[in-house]
Regions:
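Extended amphipathic ligand-handling, pore-lining, and cofactor/metal-binding catalytic surfaces
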Residues: 35-36, 40, 61-62, 79-82, ...
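Short coil-to-beta-strand
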Residues: 17-27, 62-74
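Active-site histidine-anchored catalytic micro-motif
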Residues: 23, 72-140
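Structural signal for hydrophobic packing residues in well-ordered secondary-structure cores
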Residues: 54-57, 134
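Short catalytic helix/loop segments, enriched in acidic residues and glycine
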Residues: 42-55
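Active-site and ligand/interface coordination hotspots across diverse enzymes
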Residues: 1-38
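Amphipathic, non-transmembrane alpha-helical secondary structure
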Residues: 12, 51, 97-101
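A structural motif corresponding to the C-terminal end of an alpha-helix
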Residues: 56-61, 103-107
Length: 140
């Protein structure tokens, strides 16, 4: 189920209903993937991963909502290619931490990061962000 397609009242009611609700954040990038693939290849893959994970959890009677995707990330390896939009590690990490804080404040039980962008700077950033999110008291 996609969070962005819900009303705020539906989200409130789900979180207040006593069930533990997980959030899944698709993490991709806008970067070159050769001459044959779109710039949002990582976003497409991470969204598919997140939807599949939410469906598998639903099959087990668990509730998970897919958040709107992150389409910008550190993309240093592809930065020289036209169309690639690389953001700093600090900016990307700050955004993910802000999202996690908001989810925790609203009562989400945990956050899963569905990443398909494996630039080393991005992977390191996600690991560091996950450590900080756990320190906030939100399981990742």
């Amino acid at each position: 189920m996609n969070l962005a397609e819900q009303s705020w009242m539906a989200v409130r009611d789900a979180l207040a209903g006593g069930a533990r609700v997980a959030a899944i954040l698709p993490c991709g990038a806008t970067e070159a993937h050769g001459p044959h693939l779109p710039l949002n290849t990582d976003v497409i893959i991470s969204e598919g991963m997140a939807r599949r994970a939410a469906a598998l959890l639903a099959d087990e009677g668990l509730h998970a909502w897919v958040l709107p995707s992150l389409a910008y990330a550190p993309a240093e390896y592809a930065a020289a290619f036209a169309g690639t939009v690389s953001v700093s590690v600090a900016s990307a990490k700050a955004l993910i931490l802000d999202i996690a804080r908001a989810l925790k404040a609203q009562g989400f039980a945990c956050l899963a990061l569905a990443n398909s962008h494996f630039d080393p700077a991005n992977v390191s950033m996600l690991r560091a962000a996950a450590d900080e999110i756990r320190a906030l008291g939100l399981p990742v």
